């Protein structure tokens, strides 16, 4: 039987739908939302369509701690995580280029207005 850690690692190797739970910046209440994550060069990122403001980004700017909920099909797991909102233009261009290509968006549009968060998992 495969260890849970191996299944989690394998699930993180490819992008899929995921939920994250953040802490509401004004209410302090947990806020859960479904998103898509990407594995780019071994790092985990969350992004979204361009052109919309997101409360989950504001929540992460206030408190970087979140729960990263893997929802299958390989494994289900609730992972404590840290989110780093990426604002550096060069880093955004590098990370968003393959996401934009996969989604059929103009890279410059995504760099200008898509959310982008790097997710790390504390030991």
Question: Which residues does each predicted region cover?
Answer:
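Short beta-strand segments
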Residues: 15-49, 66
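Short, structured beta-strand-loop surface elements
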Residues: 51-123
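A generic local structural motif
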Residues: 4-7, 32-33, 104
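Extreme N-terminal tail/first-helix region
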Residues: 1-17
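A generic structural micro-feature
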Residues: 12, 27-29, 60, 111
């Amino acid at each position: 039987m495969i260890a849970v850690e191996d299944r989690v690692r394998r699930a993180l190797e490819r992008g899929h739908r995921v939920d994250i739970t953040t802490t509401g910046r004004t209410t302090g209440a947990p806020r859960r939302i479904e998103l898509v994550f990407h594995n780019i060069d071994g790092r985990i990122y969350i992004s979204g369509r361009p052109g919309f403001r997101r409360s989950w980004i504001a929540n992460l700017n206030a408190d970087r701690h979140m729960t990263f909920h893997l929802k299958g099909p390989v494994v289900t797991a609730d992972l404590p995580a840290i989110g780093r909102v990426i604002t550096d233009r060069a880093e955004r261009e590098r990370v968003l280029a393959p996401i934009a290509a996969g989604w059929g968006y103009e890279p410059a549009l995504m760099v200008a207005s898509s959310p982008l968060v790097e997710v790390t998992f504390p030991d």
